[in-house]
Design a protein with these regions (language model features):
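N-terminal Lys/Arg-rich, disordered targeting/topogenic segments
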Residues: 1-21
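Short, aromatic- and cysteine-enriched interfacial helices/patches
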Residues: 3, 18, 46-54
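Hydrophobic membrane-insertion alpha-helices, especially the h-region
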Residues: 24-37
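Hydrophobic single-pass membrane-insertion segments
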Residues: 35-51
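A surface/extracellular/periplasmic glyco- and lipid-processing/surface-interacting theme
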Residues: 49-101, 106-218
Length: 218
């Protein structure tokens, strides 16, 4: 008799637990259908009031680095030809660039091509002349090219309007030379001068589908 009573008691307790779970599921379903008009309290019942509104900021992911930026990214990047010989070191604001390429030039020297897109520093330099393959890089990124001087072939290439460019040899932008380095390793330009030229030419009016990279998530 005692064993039978225990089994009966166990069945009753099980039914009671199932009924409680079912009731909680029904209450949760009603709360969801109600559109979050009330928030369930831990102790039972509901707390009146609407759920808080969360505003998600407008962000954009750089196709060059995968970094997230608030607000809109520019229509196209800026590629700057940077000196890389001993007399030019240290260069200014290279850490602000999204990408930096190193290319060989004459005399066993190299030159840097800095790609700026997510952030633009106060000034750039020391700026040096261009070569045709620097222009090719700018075309790949649908960018704006900034340099001081050019080889004969690079001049012909740029003059054919393959990319928008700013060059100290034929621009109204104000380049300047710093006193702590010797020419030709001391040519600089301020970002406000570059931005003024970009705006006046309308180079940022049309968004470009620029070259992008794939990044691993997590």
């Amino acid at each position: 008799m005692r064993r039978t009573d225990r089994r009966k008691t166990g069945r009753k307790t099980g039914k009671k637990r199932i009924s409680t779970v079912t009731l909680l599921v029904i209450i949760l379903a009603v709360a969801v259908v109600a559109g979050g008009a009330g928030v369930l309290a831990v102790g039972g019942g509901a707390v009146s009031g609407k759920l808080p509104d969360f505003h998600v900021k407008d962000v954009n992911v750089s196709p060059l680095t995968g970094q997230v930026y608030e607000g809109e990214l520019p229509a196209r990047p800026l590629i700057v030809s940077i000196d890389n010989v001993g007399d030019a070191v240290p260069q200014s604001n290279l850490s602000k660039a999204d990408l930096v390429y190193e290319f060989p030039v004459e005399g066993l020297q190299t030159r840097l091509q800095a790609v700026f897109y997510g952030e633009f520093p106060e000034f750039f330099g020391p700026i040096r002349s261009t070569r045709p393959y620097f222009v090719d890089l700018t075309r790949e990124y649908k960018g704006i090219f900034l340099a001081h001087g050019w080889s004969p072939d690079a001049r012909k290439y740029l003059m054919s309007d393959v990319v928008p460019y700013i060059n100290a040899m034929n621009t109204d932008c104000s380049f300047y030379r710093v006193s702590d380095k010797n020419a030709p390793h001391n040519s600089y330009i301020k970002w406000e001068e570059v931005k003024k030229k970009i705006d006046s030419e309308g180079w940022w009016k049309d968004k470009q589908d620029i070259h992008s990279f794939s990044f691993l998530s997590g």
